[in-house]
Design a protein with these regions (language model features):
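C-terminal scaffold of the Radical SAM
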Residues: 1-201
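Short amphipathic alpha-helical interaction segments
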Residues: 200-214
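A short, conserved structural fragment
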Residues: 214-224
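Short, amphipathic alpha-helical interaction segments positioned at domain boundaries
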Residues: 231-246
Length: 246
């Protein structure tokens, strides 16, 4: 994958964290890797669980633009294989005391990541450091996303120019889609009052899409609470597209 560290260095970092007194730490682990089988994916996940992290981010590889894999796509597992890996991995994590609270986030009891929960609930956050991203909501209803300069050397050498590389103010008609892109990843979904408070929009505008998606059994609604069904979680991209303008 082109990572700059080895597995031995990863294990060493875990030991250093424990020796430093941290009783809570997270491990990131990808699946759906080139030529990966169900057995090798389970082996990787077993190895991560054996390290006893309090939180585990287990997510599928995605091919991003401007990467080596995007220029030269590798042979990846097919959809059925990915589904088997996902199902088996979720069961393995549950059997070892890890509860899923977001599409790719699992934790032991009491160790949900507060930053993750805020982020996926469409909360605001500050991006600090090279390449960091942030989101700020303003009293007048504007919502801005920004990112800092990506390269550490460039970031640290900036004197007369701002550290922020770019900012973007969300258009009003895309805010609902942006909210859904985050909140529907959470197992518990969101409440309609939460949608209103985080976006500044009237949740009544969601009614046509919510009714349609509930009829298709992709979403489930319990009074003011909305979340994706098991099937819906497999088709989040299609669900989210319903809330963006054509």
């Amino acid at each position: 994958l082109g990572r700059i560290h080895t597995s031995d260095q990863a294990y060493a970092a875990i030991d250093f964290a424990r020796q430093a007194g941290f009783d809570s730490f997270n491990l990131d682990l990808m699946h759906g890797l080139p030529a990966q089988t169900l057995l090798s994916a389970k082996t990787d996940l077993f190895a991560a669980i054996a390290c006893k992290p309090s939180h585990l981010s287990w997510y599928q590889l995605t091919i991003e633009p401007n990467t080596v894999f995007h220029k030269r796509p590798p042979l990846l597992p097919v959809e059925d294989e990915l589904a088997d890996i996902q199902q088996c991995g979720e069961q393995l994590l549950a059997d070892n005391g890890y509860s899923q609270y977001e599409v790719s986030a699992y934790s032991q009891e009491g160790f949900n990541c507060r930053h993750n929960s805020n982020y996926w609930s469409f909360g605001d956050y500050l991006g600090i450091g090279a390449g960091a991203h942030g989101k700020i909501s303003f009293p007048d209803g504007r919502i801005k996303r920004y990112n800092k300069r990506r390269q550490p050397q460039e970031y640290m050498s900036v004197t007369s120019q701002p550290f922020v590389a770019s900012t973007r103010t969300l258009h009003r008609d895309e805010i609902a889609g942006e909210f859904m892109m985050n909140a529907l990843r959470l197992n518990d979904g969101f409440t309609l009052p939460q949608f209103a408070s985080r976006t500044g929009l009237d949740y009544a505008q969601l009614e046509p899409q919510l009714e349609l998606l509930c009829q298709r059994e992709l979403l489930v609604r319990d009074r003011n609470a909305v979340r994706a069904t098991g099937t819906g979680r497999r088709f989040l991209d299609s669900i989210i597209a319903e809330f963006f303008p054509d």
